[in-house]
Amino acid sequence: MSMKTVLCAVDISNDNRDVGVLKQAARLAEMEGAQLDVITVVPDFGMSVVGAFFDKGHHDKMVAEARTRLDDLVNTALGDGASDDQRHVVATGSAYEEILKIADTIKAELIVIGAHKPDFSDYLLGPNAARVVRHSSCSVYVVRS
């Protein structure tokens, strides 16, 4: 099976903890000669009670900051200028839902995602990685951090 697209999901809020995830995704994409797309998801406060506390342009600022941090993460993990070779997606909403939606949109054959060791809350709520694995229509490679 030859892959054309690998989607790597990273969390930019965890101080470069996903560098290893991104490096593994890049290795897999390179081995297959596949396009590497990198996604991060920012929360959608929208019309929630929390959203009422932010000014109108706050979401746009969050997305712009996320894009900058995503570029920085890619360059840190893969070397300066590496971010020019990948497509970057900053989505808004629920992390696992947006990852699955983008994977379907780009017809990814593989999703690479990081997972931390579960704690008690993960058993009640379910971590994003587990939800992606459970609901994905393509293969998922989980990198333990």
What spans do the regions from the language model cover?
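Small/aliphatic-rich secondary-structure junction motif
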Residues: 2-52
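Short, hinge-like loop/turn segments at secondary-structure boundaries
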Residues: 54-57, 105-106, 129-131
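Short, flexible loop segments at boundaries between secondary-structure elements
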Residues: 135-145
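Structural beta-alpha unit
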Residues: 1, 76-111, 118
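A short acidic, glycine-rich active-site loop
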Residues: 56-69
